């Protein structure tokens, strides 16, 4: 399977990799979509996403759900994992993290459609949920609910 030409340009999958220090340093990788032209949905869930508050340097935590309808390319999952974990030492507000991740994946993969849902855990007593999508859901695309309940605290 590794001999398949669509995998030959990958530099991270199956290799020892160093954790990127920042999102700017992280390199997403992509492979050809063997079902290009077929409308379907792929979901990635990152329940332990971490970044830093740009003002206080305190950690912020989120549950991210990334739904995308692939176009000609698929995002390679190890590179996505490394990209997402590169935010651990990155200072940015919740909105910046969530929207920039969605836009980068959408542009890089030339996706047909993408939605990212960022469910940020409370800090200072306020949960912040951030949602971005590239446009209207394509007709005929099955998009299940994210399955993430609204934050209820102890209530």
Swiss-Prot record:
**InterPro entries for the chain:** GTP-CH-I_C/QueF, NADPH_dep_7-cyano-7-deazaG_red, QueF, QueF_type1
The EC designation for this entry is: 1.7.1.13
What is its pathway?
tRNA modification; tRNA-queuosine biosynthesis
**A GO biological process held by the record:** tRNA modification
Q: Which GO terms describe its molecular function?
A: preQ1 synthase activity
| Residue positions binding substrate | 75-77, 94-95
The record lists the catalysed reaction(s) as: 7-aminomethyl-7-carbaguanine + 2 NADP(+) = 7-cyano-7-deazaguanine + 2 NADPH + 3 H(+)
Q: Where is the active site?
A: 53 (thioimide intermediate), 60 (proton donor)
Q: Alphabetically list the UniProt keywords.
A: Cytoplasm, NADP, Oxidoreductase, Queuosine biosynthesis
Record's superkingdom?
A: Bacteria
State the compartments where it is located: Cytoplasm
- Please tell me one Gene Ontology term that the record gives under cellular component: cytoplasm
Q: Family, per the entry?
A: Belongs to the GTP cyclohydrolase I family. QueF type 1 subfamily.
What HAMAP family does the entry give?
QueF_type1
**Function description:** Catalyzes the NADPH-dependent reduction of 7-cyano-7-deazaguanine (preQ0) to 7-aminomethyl-7-deazaguanine (preQ1).
Q: Which NCBIfam families match?
A: QueF-II (TIGR03139)
Protein name, UniProt field = NADPH-dependent 7-cyano-7-deazaguanine reductase
